[in-house]
Amino acid sequence: MRDPVSSQYSSFLFWRMPIPELDLSELEGLGLSDTPTYESKDSSSVGKMNGQASGTEQKNPEGDPLLEYSTFNFWRAPIASIHSVDLDLL
């Protein structure tokens, strides 16, 4: 069985750099300060921010300017366009 103390230091999560805290004042210059903040995967949510969207709003964020970058459709390859002339040849 692996020793939990020594395996702790050999893991990727121990040695990676922590993700820096997001400064909301920097978002004001980008025009994104009024967007809802999203809940972290941690269910404890000790550091919830004011103005955070509720669970139903997070599941259906209509009008979110960053939504197109967080969906599967943005990252997949575009669908090839087929013209009617090409379909007639098939």
UniProtKB/Swiss-Prot annotation:
Swiss-Prot/TrEMBL induction comment: Up-regulated during neuronal differentiation (in vitro).
Bias-annotated ranges (Polar residues): 35-58
Cellular-component GO terms for this entry: centrosome; cytoplasm; cytosol; nucleoplasm
Subunit structure as annotated in this protein's UniProt entry: Interacts with HSPA8 and LAMP2 isoform A; the interaction may target MLLT11 for degradation via chaperone-mediated autophagy. Interacts with TCF7.
Chain segments carrying region Disordered: 31-64
In-chain residues carrying the UniProt-annotated modification Phosphoserine: 84
Protein's recorded name: Protein AF1q
Reported modifications of this chain: Ubiquitinated, leading to degradation.
Gene from which the chain derives: Mllt11
Tissue specificity note: Detected in embryonic brain cortex.
UniProt record similarity statement: Belongs to the MLLT11 family.
Primary location: nucleus
Motif (Nuclear export signal): 24-32
Cellular compartments annotated: Nucleus; Cytoplasm; Cytoplasm, Cytoskeleton, Microtubule organizing center, Centrosome
Keyword Cytoplasm: yes
Pfam families in the record: WRNPLPNID (PF15017)
Entry's Gene Ontology BP terms: extrinsic apoptotic signaling pathway; intrinsic apoptotic signaling pathway; positive regulation of apoptotic process; positive regulation of DNA-templated transcription; positive regulation of mitochondrial depolarization; positive regulation of release of cytochrome c from mitochondria
Record flagged with keyword S-adenosyl-L-methionine: no
Keywords for the protein's UniProt record, in alphabetical order: Cytoplasm, Cytoskeleton, Nucleus, Phosphoprotein, Ubl conjugation
Physiological role: Cofactor for the transcription factor TCF7. Involved in regulation of lymphoid development by driving multipotent hematopoietic progenitor cells towards a T-cell fate.
